[in-house]
Amino acid sequence: MTYLEGVYWDLDGTIANTELEAHLPAFNNAFNDLGVDWNWDTNTYIKLLKINGGKNRIAFYAKSTNENFSEDLILKIHETKQFHYLEIIKKNCVSLKTGVFRLINELHRKNVRQFIVTSSSRSQVNLLVENLFNCFNPFEFIISSDDVELKKPNPLPYLEAVKFSGIKKNNSIVFEDSNPGLKSSLAANLPTIFVPSNIPIVLEENIKLDCILDSLGDENNMSNVIKGPKLRKPYVDYSFLNDYLVFFSDAKN
């Protein structure tokens, strides 16, 4: 029998608006600290998000501007960026996405097991969860970049999560907001709902989805289903997720 037993949440851009509210200013603060004559604007950073991982973005941008950065310098920039990111999180400068807290609370009350699967480091995730949810931690475990050898878009993070949870794939749902994340969860053969972040994204042609939402919604901000089952309420809730699993199962058969 198909029923909702577990939800795997991506973090950056899915649970919280971290990319523009924390990661981007942290990068620019690091450049300033180290005397690197860069200042990424929003459009530049959005383009760089196609590259997965902070160190990879620094290396890619350096190459694109014909600058010869050593691995040591790239590592130093990234370490400094991480410091500034944590400082920004401590100041509670990051907001939850619309409907996230409401849905997480409802799933918790329904005894649906919840997990985070992210490319962020464990120190980043722990601090962000602590600041966003205070004493309430609904997540059973976290798969971070520290826990796997290969990050998204490789399926390994989600395969590890499935192994640890023991939940049948067809009884779980993934929430993702990016091409690398979607490729990771789909390659792991997990039912996946795409909820875009506040950053424009063009889905890669080889990504085939059966559920796309513009947001999770709440009482004052209605969710729109771009693709998938109909909403019973103005927002995504436990019933909708169960409907989606049936929809997903029927689509496969």
Functional labels for PLM-detected ranges:
Residues 1-43:
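Active-site neighborhood of HAD-like aspartate-dependent phosphohydrolases
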Residues 2, 105, 121-122, 126-253:
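Asp-based, Mg2+/Mn2+-dependent phosphohydrolase catalytic module
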Residues 14, 118-120:
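Conserved phosphate-coupling serine/threonine residues in phosphotransfer and NTP-handling enzymes
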Residues 22, 53, 95-99, 120-121, ...:
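Short beta->alpha linker loops
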Residues 30-32, 53-69:
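Helix-loop "lid/cap" segments that line or gate small-molecule binding pockets
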Residues 34-46, 66-77, 135-139:
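Short, surface-exposed acidic
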Residues 63-101, 105, 110:
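Metal-dependent phosphoesterase signature
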